[in-house]
């Protein structure tokens, strides 16, 4: 059932215009930036948006010199966290998603996580991609 739901909602998301996705990205990150948890966070782990996902690169670029930004790197089917200080540290990795070139993995505490999703229900429950990374 989840597999069919994933497929259905990815198809629907892919139908959204680029202008709408840009608007939604801006709105979502405005909400995050105004949240007290974000304001207090020193270490933020965020996925690097891909395809029709919410565009995270502008957010990363905005905050990379103001907070410690960590992004995922997949290695042997395991998601690892890597601290980046520049977008130049990213290169195309698994599934065509930008990943850090560094293999210096972080295993400490993170203050805030921005998680990818295919869809959320009205109660805030998330349907992800089913890889078990998040």
Predicted regions and their residues:
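Redox-cofactor binding/interface segments in oxidoreductases and associated redox assembly factors
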Residues: 46, 115-116
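Surface-exposed, charge/polar-rich loops and edge strands
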Residues: 15, 108-113, 122-125
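N-terminal active-site beta-alpha-beta segment that forms phosphate/nucleotide-binding
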Residues: 1-106
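Short flexible/disordered coil segments
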Residues: 100-115, 132-134
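Membrane-associated lipid acylation/remodeling enzymes share a hydrophobic transmembrane-juxtamembrane segment
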Residues: 123-134
């Amino acid at each position: 059932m989840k597999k069919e739901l994933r497929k259905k909602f990815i198809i629907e998301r892919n139908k959204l215009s680029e202008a709408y996705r840009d608007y939604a990205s801006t709105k979502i990150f405005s909400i995050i930036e105004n949240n007290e948890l974000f304001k207090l966070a020193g270490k933020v782990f965020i996925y690097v948006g891909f395809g029709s996902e919410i565009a995270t690169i502008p957010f990363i670029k905005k905050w990379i010199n103001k907070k410690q930004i960590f992004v995922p790197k997949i290695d042997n089917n395991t998601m690892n966290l890597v601290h980046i200080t520049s977008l130049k540290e990213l290169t195309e990795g698994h599934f065509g998603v930008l990943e850090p070139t560094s293999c210096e993995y972080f295993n400490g505490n993170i203050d805030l996580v921005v998680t990818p999703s295919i869809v959320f229900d009205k109660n805030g429950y998330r349907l992800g991609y089913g890889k078990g990374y998040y």
